[in-house]
Amino acid sequence: MVGAMANNGRIRSAFPVTNGSKDLTPNSAPASTTGSEYGPVEFTREDVETLLNERIKYKSKFNYKERCENMMDYIKRLRLCIRWFQELELDYAFEQEKLKNALELNEKHCVDMEVSLKNKEEELNMIIEELRKNFESVQVQLAREQTEKLAANDSLGKEKEARLSVEKAQAGLTEELGKAQGDLQTANQRIQSVNDMYKLLQEYNSSLQLYNSKLQGDLDEAHETIKRGEKERTAIIENIGNLKGQFSALQEQLAASKASQEDIMKQKGELVNEIASLKVELQQVKDDRDRHLVEVKTLQTEATKYNDFKDAITELETTCSSQSTQIRQLQDRLVNSERRLQVSDLSTFEKMNEYEDQKQSIIDLKSRVEEAELKLVEGEKLRKKLHNTILELKGNIRVFCRVRPLLPGENNGDEGKTISYPTSLEALGRGIDLMQNAQKHAFTFDKVFAPTASQEDVFTEISQLVQSALDGYKVCIFAYGQTGSGKTYTMMGRPGNVEEKGLIPRCLEQIFETRQSLRSQGWKYELQVSMLEIYNETIRDLLSTNKEAVRTDSGVSPQKHAIKHDASGNTHVAELTILDVKSSREVSFLLDHAARNRSVGKTQMNEQSSRSHFVFTLRISGVNESTEQQVQGVLNLIDLAGSERLSKSGSTGDRLKETQAINKSLSSLGDVIFALAKKEDHVPFRNSKLTYLLQPCLGGDAKTLMFVNIAPESSSTGESLCSLRFAARVNACEIGTPRRQTNIKPLENRLSLG
């Protein structure tokens, strides 16, 4: 069998150890680079070191063409060397695999031989045992016959007649004994032959083990050779990287020299085409800049018109007030006229004419009041539009404040004592006053919603901001406030109640309706949804169908969801489930699925307290087939976990860890806002998963709006004051003008340098 193995599949010899100037190629198959312009090439250690230490000499320092050609030749030789090393590595891998296969085959053969020998040994032992039993039975029978023979001899005189029969029996027994002895001798011979075969198999097994040891040694030597080859290859790759850096620098110098040399410009037609295309793009950029300047001037003109409208509105309000006074005077006159009608001696006809005139005057005044009210509404719409435009130009984060109604069991008189709303024209609908320890704290935001405001009223104020996502902007809306202040109600609403739907389902309904209406203009949109939560500084995928991937007993997701921001400002979360959606009904189903997976818990401050930050992301990709314009918008809707004090929440155990993680991440958010407000060079976005995820939204690339939710009861005055102060600081942050992500489909074949 060994001979058969040697003849049929000869094991490839091990690679030689490379020392000094010996060849780096294996004995069996020397590596060569086939198909290169240099023909088959083999490298030694001296060749590689000479190639890496080679210094190119140039006839002229400024002859860039010669330097470029020499460098290209040098790079080709380096690539040839690398290719040779790669082939050498493949040979090593092939030899290693072949040795492994041969070793496995021999080991398997040895195991099979050992099993067969053990089986044969057991069979022979059984045969020997059976022969021994037969021999013992024959000996017993022989002893019995000899006893009978002695007894027969003693009674020979008396039993002469039986002597003949005894002799016959003795002769038969002697014959059987001879046969038994012959069988025993045959069995001994078979045992001897089996023992000889066993010794031969043991010797063959020993030779196989020696051969296996030799193969293992050859394999170890091959491993060492491969390791040394890998180390040398790593060193060569590092040197090649350095050479690539030098080559890149030389390429930059060459490009600079090409730009100043007219003869090379004529030879490099591709460079001329690239410059021409760059000029076209530069002209487009200039046109965009001019268009933006025109838009800025237009906005300035609209701002001037807004001021004029404001003055006109003030005049209309004054006129309205005077007209209201006139109406009251006319009404008084009408009453007096009616009284005079009763006592007057004038004719009924004259009194009726006067009454009709006064009635017509009242109708005219009412129509003028209605016109003034319509102009006032239009002026308010224009004011909102200009205010949003000014905020976008300034780059501020918009802040809306919402005060939730009192809950059953809370003191109904608390709100009037702690929270009030100014009635001045400047602060109407935008101001809120908080009383603490008989001290009044006044705040002004972009919008303030009283407890009577409905979900529809709140959504109306942000509908234009949501529309920006379809226009190609990044939009971020997040709710902030203490636990139990109504953040989740604002964002999600109350399931099953159409009137109390939250901002997230309303935003999606508006986006799907607008997408449908824009189809007539040639727009096609694709929408993708993802939902995650940040629980104890760990990201969980709420749309994952694998429950173990969403949550484990320890509360830590086994998957690693790393956050990455690319050069375009887009955010990617590794291993996060992203689903295409076609209707708001699909998104509602996904929201219900995410709500079931989200972490909630009971504390002393809230029966259903969110124990994690919930992030809903809608990615919008739109293309207009007629204009070939593309837009990419993102809508982030975030329900932050509520801040809480341990003394009030009474959290212990896991709830305590959750509270500490929530407060830490919100504190990191405060540090980021503080750094942005002070315009510091370093903003600590990486201090928490929440701030790092919100970096594009807080860094100036997005339109960002924050809801600060306030609880009206007096026991929450301290937390409400902290929330309002934080919101005021957020409102004062200037993070930059948001960028619209839109472009024209790029050309298929764009010329590039080099």
Swiss-Prot record:
SMART domains: KISc. InterPro entries: Kinesin-like_fam, Kinesin_motor_CS, Kinesin_motor_dom, Kinesin_motor_dom_sf, P-loop_NTPase. Residues 13-39 are annotated as: Disordered. One of its GO terms (biological process) is microtubule-based movement. It is found in: Cytoplasm, Cytoskeleton. One of its GO terms (cellular component) is microtubule. Pfam families: Kinesin. Residues 396-733 form the Kinesin motor domain. The keyword Nucleotide-binding applies. Residues 1-45 are annotated as: Globular. One of its GO terms (molecular function) is microtubule motor activity. Residues 85-209, 262-394 form a coiled coil. Residues 74-86, 207-754 are annotated as: Microtubule-binding. Residues 16-36 have a biased composition (Polar residues). ATP binds at residues 481-488. Keywords: ATP-binding, Coiled coil, Cytoplasm, Cytoskeleton, Microtubule, Motor protein, Nucleotide-binding. Composed of three structural domains; a small globular N-terminal, a central alpha-helical coiled coil and a large globular C-terminal which is responsible for the motor activity (it hydrolyzes ATP and binds microtubules). Bind to microtubules in an ATP-insensitive manner (in vitro). Homodimer and heterodimer with KIN14M/KATB (in vitro). Belongs to the TRAFAC class myosin-kinesin ATPase superfamily. Kinesin family. KIN-14 subfamily. This is Kinesin-like protein KIN-14N.
